[in-house]
C-alpha cells in the first residue's frame, strides 16, 4: 500500500476510488474537479466547475456500466459501445466511428480503447500541480495509447497530452479523436459557445 497526500485545499489527486466497480481517479483544484473512469477507457465522466457547481459533461440516463461485467445479447457491432456508454469524454483510437474491419480484425463502434481498462500512475501530487498518466495497449490492433491529465493551481483548465504509438513492424493507419459530449446544466437556452 502506498501513501497518498490527503489535502483539503490546493491541487489534489487520488486513485484510491471506485465508482460502480470501476477504478476511478479524481483530479481537482479550487476551481475544477475531473473524475476519470480508469477501468473504462480512461473516460472523463465528470468535469465540474466548482464555483458554479456546473458539470459540463452530458450523461446517459442509465449512467456508468462496467463493460467487463456486460455480456452482449446481440452480435450488433454498435451494441457494446452504446450499451456501456455513460456520456462524458472519450479518447477514440485507433479507430473511430462506425464498426469496421481493421486488417482482418472486427472492430466495434468507436474502437476498442474506449471500453478497455487503462493503467494509471500519479506523476505529480503537490498543492501547486497534480498530474496522472493513463495508458493502454489495444487487444485487436497494435497500438499503445497514452494520455496525461494535469491541473495547476489557480487555473480552471485541464491540460491534456496524448500520444499513440504503432507497435507493429509494418505501418498502420489510425483514427485518433476526442468524443466530447457536453450537456445540461451547462448546455441550456442561454449558453453561448
Write out the residue ranges for each language-model feature.
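Surface-exposed acidic/polar loop and edge beta-strand patches at domain peripheries
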Residues: 1-159, 170-173, 177-193
Amino acid at each position: 500500500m502506498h501513501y497518498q497526500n490527503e489535502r483539503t485545499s490546493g491541487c489534489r489527486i487520488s486513485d484510491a476510488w471506485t465508482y460502480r466497480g470501476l477504478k476511478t481517479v479524481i483530479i481537482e483544484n479550487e476551481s475544477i474537479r475531473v473524475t476519470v473512469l480508469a477501468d473504462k477507457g480512461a473516460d472523463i465522466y465528470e468535469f465540474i466547475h466548482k464555483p458554479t457547481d456546473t458539470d459540463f459533461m452530458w450523461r446517459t440516463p442509465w449512467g456508468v456500466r462496467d463493460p467487463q461485467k456486460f455480456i452482449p445479447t446481440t452480435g450488433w457491432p454498435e451494441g457494446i459501445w452504446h450499451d456501456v456508454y455513460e456520456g462524458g469524454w472519450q479518447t477514440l483510437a485507433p479507430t473511430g466511428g462506425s464498426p469496421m474491419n481493421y486488417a482482418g480484425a472486427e472492430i466495434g463502434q468507436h474502437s476498442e480503447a474506449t471500453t478497455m481498462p487503462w493503467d494509471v500512475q500519479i506523476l505529480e501530487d503537490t498543492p501547486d500541480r497534480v498530474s496522472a498518466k493513463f495508458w493502454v495497449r489495444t487487444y485487436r490492433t497494435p497500438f499503445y495509447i497514452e494520455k496525461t491529465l494535469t491541473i495547476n493551481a489557480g487555473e480552471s483548465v485541464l491540460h491534456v497530452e496524448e500520444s499513440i504509438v504503432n507497435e507493429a513492424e509494418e505501418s498502420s493507419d489510425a483514427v485518433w479523436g476526442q468524443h466530447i459530449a457536453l450537456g445540461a446544466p451547462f448546455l441550456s437556452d442561454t449558453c453561448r459557445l
